[in-house]
Amino acid sequence: MLVSIVIPCYNSEHSIKKTVELTVEEFKKLPGYECEFVLVNDYSKDGTFASIKELCGKYPFVKGINLSRNFGQHNAIMAGLNYAEGDYIIGMDDDLQTHPSQIPKLIGKIEEGYDLVFGHFGETKFGFFKKLTSKIASFLTWHMIKRPKGIQASNFWICQKFVRDEIVQYKNYNLYLQVLFYRTTSNIANVEIEHFAREEGKSNYTFKKLLALWLSCLNYTVVPLRLATLLGGICAAGGVVGAVAVFVRKLLNPGIPVGWASLMCVLF
């Protein structure tokens, strides 16, 4: 069985080689499974694509994609999914925090009959800022896009081929990958995995990038529209009540200057 591993790469010229090599070694321990890699360089500022080309020359099962500018992690993954041909598709990071040694747990869980499995980190090695932003993202996906109850999403996942086939039909730019997963299937599970510390460098997610990602959630929900409708209804009702109050006051107090009541009604 072929397993495609899609990795978005950004400024990872040193870690991507080790990530691929450790994954290759891990698959040697899994009889009946083969792997292919789709490495997507998201316009890195270092020699990441040179490392990808070197890996392509070393391994015939490695595909390299070089994006013309920085499109962001989710768009980079989508680009890679278009070239993934496996029966299962795994998404993971390039920094070894989503460690290849945990892949057998993902495969074992999806073999139980699930369409999509997210790795759930029992204890994370993230810093305070990353933990905070992850909690915000969880809140948004739960309350705005109806994430299945009890499911913890992460960047380490495995899905069936039909899930990939459905997702790649989405052609818009501002995408939030997890939402597309939730729209495709509800047969989702978690499996607890170990989260490893970053071996070098720091997270490439700035607050600006995270904010843009969160705002992309608005493309998939009617919650803002419902809130705007509710607010509009409240304002309209308040205006009617105010106009009635002004009209009644005018009737009870004819001495109010001419034009005041009509002006107040217009303002309400």
Task: Describe these PLM feature segments.
Residues 2-4, 36:
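Cell-envelope/extracellular polymer assembly enzymes that use nucleotide-activated donors
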Residues 31-43, 65-66:
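Short beta-strand/loop segment that forms part of the nucleotide-sugar
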Residues 41-50, 96-97:
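A conserved acidic beta->alpha catalytic loop
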Residues 176-268:
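Hydrophobic helical membrane-anchoring modules
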